[in-house]
């Protein structure tokens, strides 16, 4: 299997052109290639496929083999993958995902993609569509307790579920201990990604994320979009802000007119290779 390892702010996946080569059993392949000791090492596997409704289709799998709806960091890399490999000559393309069709605008320098702006669509705020078991609409400051820990969560879906709460010092927070308790909480029928956020100023927030099925990652694009949404709903930031993640910064904007979330950030190729599977 030919592959390319890429990352968006350290959120790394193995990217495979599944148009020119047939890939069977991607769930097991993802578990194998993701292993950082016995495989290639990644947060998961991304397949680029043909689409009947968009320029390309992406399917993505977490390191535990489960399929995910969407990943903001991964979709930026898909844009770079197809452009840099001359699978398209367009700087604006559409990608079919399990969370709908996304539009990518790519910034090109010296024939290569350096930045990708993604129209992530409208955030989903209805409890049953996120999904979260709550009577609130939107779900702002839903008090949830797991073991001895209690937080007020604001819940948003960007095609995948996110629960966001605000704390004083995100760097010192014991995420590995507390994140998984809320990921699998009964309030979330399909589990959830969990974001812990520190407010820096009206234009900047800092976050760490416990990703559903992957644990802590260096960055989560949909998580950054959900955090911006929650922060606007709570009046903490304006409609455009910098979201600081462990792997770097993303610029997120909640457009006032079309109500869509736009995410801008880098995409990086690490190396290419072949592996027997």
Curated annotation (Swiss-Prot):
Substrate binds at residues 11, 62, 72-73, 160, 193, 211-212, 221-222. It comes from Methanococcus maripaludis (strain DSM 14266 / JCM 13030 / NBRC 101832 / S2 / LL). It catalyses: (2S,6S)-2,6-diaminopimelate = meso-2,6-diaminopimelate. Its EC number is 5.1.1.7. It is found in: Cytoplasm. The active site is at residues 71, 220. GO terms for cellular component: cytosol. This is Diaminopimelate epimerase. Homodimer. One of its GO terms (biological process) is lysine biosynthetic process via diaminopimelate. Belongs to the diaminopimelate epimerase family. Catalyzes the stereoinversion of LL-2,6-diaminopimelate (L,L-DAP) to meso-diaminopimelate (meso-DAP), a precursor of L-lysine. Pathway: Amino-acid biosynthesis; L-lysine biosynthesis via DAP pathway; DL-2,6-diaminopimelate from LL-2,6-diaminopimelate: step 1/1. It is an enzyme of class 5 (isomerase). InterPro entries: DAP_epimerase_AS (IPR018510), DAP_epimerase_DapF (IPR001653). It comes from the Archaea.
């Amino acid at each position: 299997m030919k592959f390319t390892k890429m990352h968006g702010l350290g959120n790394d996946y193995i990217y495979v052109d599944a148009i020119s080569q047939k890939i069977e059993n991607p769930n097991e392949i993802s578990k194998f290639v993701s292993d950082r000791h016995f495989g290639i090492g990644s947060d998961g596997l991304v397949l680029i496929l043909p689409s009947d409704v968009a320029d390309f289709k992406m399917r993505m799998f977490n390191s535990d083999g489960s399929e995910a709806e969407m990943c903001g960091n991964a979709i930026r890399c898909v844009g770079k993958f197809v452009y840099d490999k001359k699978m398209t000559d367009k700087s604006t393309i559409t990608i079919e995902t399990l969370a709908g069709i996304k539009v990518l605008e790519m910034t090109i320098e010296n024939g290569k993609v350096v930045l990708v702006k993604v129209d992530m669509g409208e955030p989903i705020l209805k409890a049953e569509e996120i999904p979260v078991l709550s009577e609130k609409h939107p779900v702002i400051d839903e008090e949830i307790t797991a073991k001895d820990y209690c937080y007020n969560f604001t819940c948003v879906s960007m095609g995948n579920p996110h629960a966001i709460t605000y704390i004083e010092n995100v760097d010192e927070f014991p995420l590995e201990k507390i994140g998984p308790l809320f990921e699998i909480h009964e309030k979330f029928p399909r589990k959830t990604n969990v974001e812990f956020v520190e407010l820096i100023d009206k234009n900047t927030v800092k976050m760490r994320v416990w990703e559903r099925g992957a644990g802590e990652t260096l960055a989560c694009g949909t998580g950054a979009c959900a955090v911006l949404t929650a922060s606007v709903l709570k009046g903490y930031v304006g409609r455009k802000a910098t979201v600081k993640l462990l792997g770097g910064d993303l610029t997120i904007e909640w457009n006032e007119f079309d109500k869509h979330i736009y995410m801008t950030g880098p995409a990086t190729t690490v190396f290419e290779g072949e592996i027997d599977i």
